[in-house]
Amino acid sequence: DTESRVDFTNGFTESYGDPLGMKASWESIVNFKDIAATERTKKLSANAQWFEDNSPVDGRFKKEKVKGISAKVITAAILGGDLYPSTAIGINLPNSNWVRKEYGSKSVTIGNITDAYNKAAHGNGFLNEYVIDKSTLDNINKYGDACDELHTDLHECLGHGSGKLLPGVDPDSLKAY
């Protein structure tokens, strides 16, 4: 389902915490779609083939036909299990490579969590200490949050949705690395 305004995930979903990648941890999220921000991710998804074709990657690792990338930005209303109290800023399902290859992927950016992390980082002194000059600092303060949101969208929509493994390569060969 890619059209619902309210959605949820509830169950044993992610296997990152298991070194063998076999047991998943339980997580739950109830959310609603951020319509305006979702338009931004839809533009990226609609152009996924262009990004794939023009990426600076050996052609053996490029998908000939990118398909089924759906993307949205959500506002998390409730988090539980492995998603609480600290959650990721994005979700990409399914985890199975063969399902992704056959049907595509569902990319989600959790907008209110990204916004909260960005706000928490403001005023902590890091930028004042390490940014080279006032002009650069002004640009970071003006555009930094928007750039961070776009970076997350690019990662979720195109990073997880791009590329392919060579024939015979086990998708779990790197385990938790």
What is the predicted function of each stretch?
Residues 1-138, 144, 148:
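Contiguous, non-catalytic segments that form substrate-binding/exosite surfaces or channel walls
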Residues 150-164:
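Active-site recognition of the HExxH zinc-binding catalytic motif
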Residues 52-55, 161, 165:
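A generic secondary-structure signal for well-formed alpha-helical elements
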Residues 163-177:
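Post-HEXXH active-site segment of zinc metalloproteases
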